[in-house]
């Protein structure tokens, strides 16, 4: 009987307040603050204002990808409407990017979203995150044409994917 490699990416379901989610929220605060000109404290507070129960069953979830026990990628989803889940907080540790972890995360989130009965995935990202836009496009998401309202100098870019 062979054992799985210790360095194999493994996903666990957590809630927003789980210590495994802390690196996700902390690095997202740094990333968003640097790209959009806010303070880390303000972004951190904003990230935590989303009610944690919206990222919990039965309508939502949060997954963290562990590599050798260390959180390296993660993301959440919540109910958008009866047939659509909305992705939130998609993140990969900057030291582990460009290794396929984000695509593996999206696939795992989509599997969980399908299991919850949703058929579509909606998301927005900021216009200063071209890497995120490239990830979503290369993962089968379609950029929506209609412009979304700007939030200050931030222009959200929306994507949609129908799951099979």
Give the predicted meaning of each segment.
Residues 93-99, 127:
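Active-site acidic-Proline motif in GNAT/NAT acetyltransferases
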Residues 20, 100, 131:
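Residues that form or flank phosphate/diphosphate-binding pockets in enzymes
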Residues 4-88, 93-94, 106-108, 112, ...:
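Acetyl-CoA-dependent GNAT
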């Amino acid at each position: 009987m062979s054992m799985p490699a210790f360095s194999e990416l493994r996903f666990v379901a957590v809630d927003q307040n789980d210590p495994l989610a802390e690196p996700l929220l902390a690095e997202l605060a740094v990333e968003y603050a640097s790209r959009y000109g806010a303070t880390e404290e303000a972004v951190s507070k904003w990230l935590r204002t989303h009610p944690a129960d919206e990222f919990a069953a039965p309508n939502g979830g949060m997954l963290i990808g562990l590599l050798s026990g260390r959180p390296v990628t993660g993301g959440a989803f919540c109910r958008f409407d009866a047939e659509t889940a909305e992705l939130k907080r998609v993140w990969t540790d900057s030291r582990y990017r460009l290794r396929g972890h984000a695509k593996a995360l999206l696939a795992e989130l989509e599997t969980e979203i399908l299991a919850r009965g949703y058929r579509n995935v909606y998301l927005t990202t900021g216009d200063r995150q071209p890497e995120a836009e490239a990830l979503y496009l290369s993962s089968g998401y379609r950029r929506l044409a209609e412009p979304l309202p700007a939030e200050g100098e931030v222009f959200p870019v929306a994507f949609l994917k129908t799951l099979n």
